Amino acid sequence: MGNSLGCSASGERLVSAARDGDAVEARMLLELSPALARYSTFGGLNSPLHFAAAKGHLDIVTLLLEKGADVNVRNYCGQTALMHACRHGHWEVVQMLLLFRCNVTRADYLSGRTALHFAAHDGLVRCVRLLLADFVPSAPLEDGASSTVDGGECQTNSGSSPCSSLGLKFNESARLRYINKPADGGVTALHMAALNGHFDCMQLLIDLGANVSAVTFPYGTTANLIGAGSTPLHYAAGGGNAECCQLLLSKGASKLTLNCNGWLPIDVARMFGRRFLEPLLSPNSNSSIPAYQPSNYLALPFMSILNIAREFGLLHTVASVDDSDLCAVCLERSCSVAAEGCCHEFCIKCALYLCSTSNTRVEFTGPPGSIPCPLCRNGIMSFTKLPSTPTEGLKSSSALTFCNPCMLNTRSVDSPATISKAEIRRNRVAAVSSELVCPLTCSPFPSSALPTCRCSDDDPCDAIETQDGSEVQSPQPSHCASMEMDKREQQDLDRTSCSGMFWSRRSCHREEQCNAEINA
């Protein structure tokens, strides 16, 4: 049962094309039957979007999303395409999923791991930076004013910022909750990065608010080897990376914290044969701890350019016919945004990739977190759109247009009012979201208790209207019920999964099944 709602020959071909990276085949199939993009798993364990994201096929991921694939669809284990892209380090796929407004806070059914846990486990710092982009606002100028661009000249408008001009809201507590979200056993993303010795990833997480004193829980089975109640310093000591231990100590981690087994970090180091860490972790040690600068991967302009790309489009930027208006980086597309401060102009795609690939190890003029301008080497804190930028936007998928209950209505926005019976039979499950058909075996996991509507108070779901203008009551819950569901989901986000099955045979078997299907 579950998501396996049946299959067809064209569905099998789409799965194979998504797995093998055959963009021509995938495009042909979706042109013949666009509803294929909204199917869930075609009788398997993963959707075509999962296959394409795990393999890093950016063109197929983009094609599926434009054709209406649910960006937050889950597989048999409750994992999203974003988790697969982060697990395999495909940061360009992560970036594309973020442009289609995927939900980064979702956790899988097995252990409560988010995409941030998957990225931190392997030290994929670019993926970590992308996942946190919506939680880190582009800082304003020192005088509290922001600049806009008019006719190529930089002007100052007080009381306005790039984030406020797009109607964005920033919630610091949401960032701290997400970055410190514990998985099964209380393991955070910082624990995972510390255990595997990923210094750059740890530094970025700490700079953005990761708790260096977070402890694992006395229940759960993910941390039995080191012990419950362990801090990231215990994990770094077990991993054996001296630089990671120094970083944690410089940020306030304590050498005297005992875990539930009564072990200090130095005891964990001895158990794992890390004797070279004893002078550093000894409670009586007087060894000097270096002071660390902010992370080289901190990119404050990310939020501004990411939301400009969402609103004004990234994929459909036309080439410029005027050489004077060409982007100085790619020399192909017309300039659409300007760097705040130096006012140099770029196309949206180049500005986005400047933030995605920035690794400021060279000297430049700018505050921490700014990225160097490729033309003048001055620091860029945010981007602003040019007045002449056309509002094209990304082609919305059904997952962005409707919440899950509204997707039960099989009539698409772009489809005609009258639909033949044959088309109804062919597309009878096309609009059913995977969230509505959860596998029965996932019910014991707390993380599977998801609300059926993702609409917020500021962006309610639009009611579907009939041809005569009268509203048709959509099958979404009442406003009070939706608020209660959102509150319940937030409680589920804060509460870790204590299923005790993260490393159990059943959970591992389910995850191995999904991974084996992708790697086949």
From Swiss-Prot:
Pathway: Protein modification; protein ubiquitination. Its EC number is 2.3.2.27. Keywords: ANK repeat, Metal-binding, Repeat, Transferase, Ubl conjugation pathway, Zinc, Zinc-finger. Transmembrane segments: none annotated. It comes from the Eukaryota. A zinc finger (RING-type) spans 327-377. The keyword Transferase applies. It catalyses: S-ubiquitinyl-[E2 ubiquitin-conjugating enzyme]-L-cysteine + [acceptor protein]-L-lysine = [E2 ubiquitin-conjugating enzyme]-L-cysteine + N(6)-ubiquitinyl-[acceptor protein]-L-lysine. It holds the Pfam family RING_XB3-XBAT31. One of its GO terms (molecular function) is zinc ion binding. Coiled coil: none annotated. Residues 467-479 have a biased composition (Polar residues). Residues 484-493 have a biased composition (Basic and acidic residues). Residues 467-493 are annotated as: Disordered. GO terms for biological process: protein ubiquitination. ANK repeats lie at residues 44-73, 77-106, 111-140, 185-214, 228-258. InterPro entries: Ankyrin_rpt (IPR002110), Ankyrin_rpt-contain_sf (IPR036770), E3_Ligase-Neurotoxin (IPR052391), RING_XB3-like (IPR056760), Znf_RING (IPR001841), Znf_RING/FYVE/PHD (IPR013083), Znf_RING_CS (IPR017907). This is Probable E3 ubiquitin-protein ligase XBOS33. It comes from Oryza sativa subsp. japonica (Rice).
